[in-house]
Amino acid sequence: MSSYRLPKRGLVDRNVPLSFTFDGRPMQGLEGDTLASALLANGRMLVGRSFKYHRPRGILTAGAAEPNALVTVGRGGRAEPNTRATMQELYEGLEARSQNRWPSLAFDIGALNGLLSPFLGAGFYYKTFMWPAPLWEKLYEPVIRRAAGLGKASYEADPDAYEKSWAHCDLLVIGAGPTGLAAALTAGRAGARVILVDEGSLPGGSLLSDTATIDGKAAADFARDTSDELRSMPNVQVLVRTTAFGWYDGNVFGAVERVQKHVREPASHLPVERLWRIVAGKALLATGAEERPLVFGGNDRPGVMMAGAMRAYLNRYGVAPGRTPAIFTTNDTGYTLAQELEAAGVDVVAIVDSRPAAGVDYRGKARLVREAVVCGTKGGKAISAIEVHHGGRTETIAVDALAMAGGFDPIIHLACHRGGKPVWSAEKAAFLAPGSLKGLEVAGGAAATTGLAACLGEGAARAEAIVRELGLPCPPVAVVKVESEEGIRSPAPLWSIPGIKDKAFVDFQNDVHLKDIGLAVREGYSHVELAKRYTTSGMATDQGKLSNVNAIGLIAKARGVSPAEVGTTTFRPFYTPVSFGALTGAHTGHHFQPVRKSPLHDWAKKHGAVFVETGLWYRSSWFPRSGERTWRESVEREVLNVRKNAGLCDVSMLGKIEITGSDAAEFLNRVYCNAFLKLPVGKARYGLMLREDGFIYDDGTTSRLEENRFFMTTTTAYAAGVMNHLEFCAQVLWPQLDVRLASITDQWAQMAIAGPKARMILQKIVDEDISDAAFPFLAAKEVSLFGGALHGCLFRISFSGELAYELAVPAGYGESIADALLEAGKDHGIMPYGVETLSVLRIEKGHVTHNEINGTIVPADLGFGKMVSAGKPDFVGKAMLQREGLTAPDRPQLVGVVPLDPQQSFRSGSHILAKGAAATLENDEGYVTSSAYSPHVGSTIALALVRNGRNRHGEEVLVWSGLHGESTPARLCNPVFFDPQNERLHV
C-alpha cells in the first residue's frame, strides 16, 4: 500500500479531488472528506500542540468530541479558531492553520514547558506564585494569560449573515444514527410532524462506518435510502449539519445549523449559520455513545486514536490511519476493527486485550495478547512502538498507529440540562440518563443499548409508543434483518494502567494527566466539582466529553468507592461551542436602522466631541482639550466648570412626545403613578410610569404648556417603547378618551444650560423675564428669543443639581442657538459638556437612570413611595404594586456608597456584602448600580440598591467584585452627595 488512501473503500467521491492547505503546505483530498480524514490520507499525523506542555498531538476521534485536532480555518473576518478538524468538511481552497505553537508546528519552543512539568501540576498557579505578591498583577498573571488560549480570534468584522428560526413538531429526534432513523421513519409514516437533527453532514451516524448489512443492504445504503424516504415526506424535516446544544423549559431545544460552513465563499442570500429554537411535543435522544479512551503512558502520542475513529476513517473515508497498527481493547469491538482492517489489506500487528478471554471468535492474522495492557508508547512526533505488559514482563512492539477501545459512555448531556443527574450503572459500566424525563426519552446507544439490531428495534418501538400517545394510528413496525453485526460489547472498565512511566493523559486538551487527579484527591479536592476546577479536567473546549468519566473513575479508585458515590459534574448548555454570530442572528450591524444624529451633532463634532453610541443615537460623551491625556481629565474639568460657572449639554436625544386633547390630563393621570390631573399650566412635573406588574417602566418630566397640551420627555433608550405603550393605552385600554399622541423627538433641538451662571447667560437671548420670581423651579412655557425672531420652549429643570434650564428650539436652529449661547457665556466661563459629565453630575445629586430602574424596582425602592398617588381611582400598575412582595421592608433600596479610603475605588456591578461576610449568594446584600469619581467629594462615589438600605446609612460594608478580584471597604450613606437641601436649584 503506497498511500494512506485505500483504493476502493469509503463514501468519498474519488472523481472530485479537492485542493487545500495546512500550515501553507498544499495537499489533496476528496469530496466527502473531513479535514481530519484528508490530513490522515496525506500521512499527516502531527496536527497540533497541547495546551500546557505543548506536546505533539494527533487526531484522536472522528467526531464532535475531538480534543486535539483544533485548527484555525479561513482568513480575515472569516477566520475561525478552534475548529475541530474532525467536523470541518473539506472544500476546494480550504486554508487551515495549526494553533498554539511557535515558531512552527514541527518545532515548538513551548515544548520546553515539558521540562518544567514537575512544577506545573494540578493547581500550580495557586502554589507557585505566592511571593512576592506585588508581582502577581505585574508579571505572573499577564504571563499566564498570554500563554493561555489556543487559537486567536480575528480582529476583523465578520462579513457573514446569520439568522434565527422557530420550529414546532410532535416529535424531535436528536441523532440520525440507526436508532434515530428508525424512530423518525416510524413516526413519519404514522403522519406525525417530525424533525430529525444530526450534527453530521449525512444522516446515518455509525451506519456510515459500519460493514453490517440491513435487509440485504449495506448499512450506509440503508441510511441513504431511509433518509431519502424521510425527505420525501411533507410532515418530516431533516436537518443535517445541525447540533442540538441545549434542552430548556417548555420542551424547547436549541440547535445550530451550519448552513454554509462547508463552502469557501458563502452565498450572500443565505446565512452561514442558523439558530433553531424547536418546540417539541416529545423528544427522543438518539445521540449514541462516545468511546472511552484508555489511560496509559504516552496515550497522547500522534497515531494513537479511538478504535471507533479508526473504523470511521477506514470505512467511511477510505483512509488507513496506519500501515502496521495495533489495537488495545477492553471489549469486543476491538476485534471487529481488526477484521475490517485486515479485510482492507492493513496488517494488524497485535490485539492487546485486558481480559482473559474475548466474547467473539477471532480468526484473523493479528497476534493476540490476552490479560495484557499497553503501558507506554514510543516515538517523537508520531508513535513508533508500544510497550505491552503481560505475564509479568514488558515487551516492545513496533507499530505506526494504535487504536484504543475502552468501552462506551452514552451521550446524555442534553438529558441533564434541566437539573437531572446521570445514574451510574455497574452492569453497563457507564453513566445513564436520569429516569422520568418529562418530554424527553432516551434510546439506542444513548441508553447503553448494544447491537445494531437492538438499536434499530428500540428506536422504532419508542417512536411507535410516542405516536400512539399522540393519538395517531401507527402502522405495524417493520422488523429489519441485520447480518454481519458487530460483536456484543463486553464492558470491563480499566481506569488506569499499572507501571506507567510517561504521562498518562485523562484530559487531552488541558493536559491533565493521571498524577494530577491523584494529587487533587490527596490534597483534599476529592469532590468531583472541586477536582474538576483544581485540575481543569473537563474545562476545555470539548467540555470533558472524553475525559469526564475516566476522571470520575480515577477519583473513585483513589477514594476506594464506586463511581456512583463520586457522582458527576453539572451538564450545562452548550453541548458543543456555538458561535456568537448564531446566537446574535440578524442583529448585527445597522441593517436598515438609521444612525440617529442630534441636530447638534455637527456642532459637537466641531467642538471636538468624542461620541458614544446610545442605541441608534450618537451622543457627545466628552469634549477633550489640548494637554488632557485621559478622558477622566476632560470629564473632571467639565464637572468642575458646571459647578463653578456654566455648561452647555446636548439633550436632544431624550424622547419627546406631545399629548393633546380634552382628556390629555386624565390620560396622563392614568399612565403615571403620581398625580397629573391638576398640574397647572406653565408647570413641569417629574413622573414615574409603571408597567402592569407594578415595576417602574420609565421616568421623565411632563410639562403643561396649555390647558390641553402637554410636552413629555422620556429616557433616550425607552422613547420608542414609551410611545408604543401610550398608544396601546389610548387605543386599547381607554379608547373613549379624547387624546392624541405625536412623537416630536426629531422636531426639536434641546440643550441643557446648567451652572450658577446659567441664568445670566440665558437671559441674554431669552426675551421674557426668567428670574427666580418670574420663572421658578419646574416652570415651563413657550418663550421668544432675540426679540421675537424665534420661539422655543423653556423648562426650568435640572439633572445636575445646579441652577439649570432646558431650551428646546426647532431642530434647524439648534446649531445657531448653541453658538449664540457659547457667545453669550464666553465671559462667564461656559463650556460644552457631554454625557459622561452628565452622569457624574447626576450621581452626585442622587438622580436615577435605567441603571437603577432595572425592571425589578418600584417607586418606594428609590425613595419615591410618597409620589404614588393614593387618591387616584386607578393607574397602570396600581393593583400589582400592592402585592406583598413589593412592599416588604427588606426590598433593595437606593443608597449612596463611598470608600473608607478615598484613594480606593469600585466598579458598577460590584456586590455589597456585610462587613466580615463571606462572598456567597446568601450574603449578597445588593449591588452597585452606578459609580464615578466625584471631584466634589474627592473620591469615587456610587449609587447602589441594598437590602433595607435606607435604614443602614453609616454602616460599613464590603464592595466586592469577584470578576475583577477586588474588595473595597466602604460606607453606606445618603444617595444625595451634593446640595442635599436643594439650595442651588432655587437661586
Swiss-Prot record:
Catalytic activity: sarcosine + (6S)-5,6,7,8-tetrahydrofolate + O2 = (6R)-5,10-methylene-5,6,7,8-tetrahydrofolate + glycine + H2O2; sarcosine + O2 + H2O = formaldehyde + glycine + H2O2
Keyword Zinc: no
Gene Ontology molecular function: any one: sarcosine oxidase activity
Assigned EC number: 1.5.3.24
GO CC terms of this entry: cytoplasm
Residues that, per the record, bind NAD(+): 198-199, 206, 244, 445
InterPro entries hit by this protein: 2Fe-2S-bd_N (IPR042204), FAD/NAD-bd_sf (IPR036188), FAD/NAD-binding_dom (IPR023753), GCST_C (IPR013977), GCV_T_N (IPR006222), GcvT/YgfZ/DmdA (IPR028896), GcvT/YgfZ_C (IPR029043), Sarcosine_oxidase_asu (IPR006277)
Biological process (GO), any one: tetrahydrofolate metabolic process
NCBIfam families per record: soxA
Function text: In the presence of tetrahydrofolate, catalyzes the oxidative demethylation of sarcosine to yield glycine, 5,10-methylenetetrahydrofolate and hydrogen peroxide. In the absence of tetrahydrofolate, catalyzes the oxidative demethylation of sarcosine to yield glycine, formaldehyde and hydrogen peroxide.
Subunit annotation: Heterotetramer composed of subunits alpha (SoxA), beta (SoxB), gamma (SoxG) and delta (SoxD).
Homology family: Belongs to the GcvT family.
Protein name: Sarcosine oxidase subunit alpha
